[in-house]
From Swiss-Prot:
Putative odorant or sperm cell receptor. Residues 1-24, 79-99, 158-195, 260-271 are extracellular. This is Olfactory receptor-like protein OLF1. Glycans are attached at residue 4. It is found in: Cell membrane. PANTHER family: OLFACTORY RECEPTOR (PTHR48018).
């Protein structure tokens, strides 16, 4: 690299380059989706916190999953909404670092929480007599603390290595937020270490969580198949239905990100995938756990009745 370069102090987020009238339409669509994310996840957290019937480890984990979803989207969507209405789509170097750090931290935290939820279901179904001992309040809190520590440590590694790089002259990020792959393309220094970290350390977090989930469900399935009555098998496995659906959507998306062939790495493909896991999944999770869970539906009905009776 020669000495004739200018260090970048801010980036331009290209976002979704379309006609101005379509920008307004996209703004309204994503604003509506973000409103659903806020309402759904905050509503679910409040319901779990206030309803005495939902004070179990499973719902404690679910409440933290909703919090991680909410924070993950909130690290990205507000800036994206502002950029739809503004001609100035810039973000400072430090702002970009913060956005990337928090989005990466909460994404990885969510993976760890989903793994903890799978372990919780394993203990509940395979060792029901020891459930209250194994999944005590203290253990549950530690699992959540470790999930947040794991997510933040992973993010700290990626953020530190990404922002010690020099960015010269080119400053247009072909994305709607500061994500690592499009950011690395702008660096004027060697990014081989970052690319190695992304493909090994980054994927190892998801692979570890995926392995925990697969092993947990292997033992769950073995226990369920030992139940003689079909109604008993169905009732037992139904307690995992919401979690399995959530895992299939989230981990399926991440597995596609890490396993897709190189010819599928295009900016537009990345944007579509990013919209799915930053916005669509946080919209779907509260719906999945509300519509497919009898306890949550009953708690919602009790909350509505209480509100009606008190008014």
């Amino acid at each position: 690299m020669d000495g004739n370069y200018t260090l970048v102090t801010e980036f331009i987020l290209l976002g979704f380059p379309t006609r101005p009238e379509l920008q307004i339409v996209l703004f309204l669509v994503f604003l509506t989706l973000y409103g659903i994310i806020l309402t759904g996840n905050i509503g679910l957290m409040m319901l779990i916190r206030t309803d005495p019937h939902l004070q179990t480890p499973m719902y404690f984990f679910l409440s933290n999953l909703s919090f991680a979803d909410l924070c993950f989207s909130s690290a990205i969507v507000p800036k994206m909404l502002v950029n739809f209405l503004s001609e100035n789509k810039s973000i400072s170097l430090y702002g970009c670092a913060l956005q990337f750090y928090f989005s990466c931290a909460f994404a990885d935290t969510e993976s760890f929480i989903l793994a903890a939820m799978a372990y919780d279901r394993y203990v509940a179904i395979c060792n029901p007599l020891l459930y209250t001992v194994v999944m005590s309040r203290g253990i549950c809190v530690w699992l959540i603390v470790l999930s947040y520590i794991g997510g933040n440590m992973s993010s700290l590694v990626h953020t530190s290595f990404a922002f010690i790089l020099k960015y010269c002259d080119k400053n247009v990020i072909n994305h709607f937020f500061c994500d690592l792959p499009p950011l690395l393309k702008l660096s004027c220094t060697d990014t081989s270490v970052n690319e190695w970290l992304l493909s090994t350390y980054g994927s190892s977090v998801e692979i570890f969580c995926f392995i925990v989930i697969v092993i947990s469900y292997y033992f769950i399935l073995r226990s369920v198949l030992r139940i003689r009555s079909s109604s008993g098998r169905k009732k037992t496995f139904s307690t995992c239905a919401s979690h399995l659906t959530s895992v299939a959507i989230y981990q399926g998306t991440l597995l596609f990100i890490y396993s897709r062939p190189t010819y599928l790495y295009t900016p537009n493909t990345d944007k579509i995938i990013s919209v799915f896991y930053t916005i669509i999944i946080p919209v779907l999770n509260p719906l999945i756990y509300s519509l497919r869970n009898k306890d949550v539906k009953d708690a919602a009905k009790r909350a509505v009745r209480l509100k009606v009776d008190s008014s």
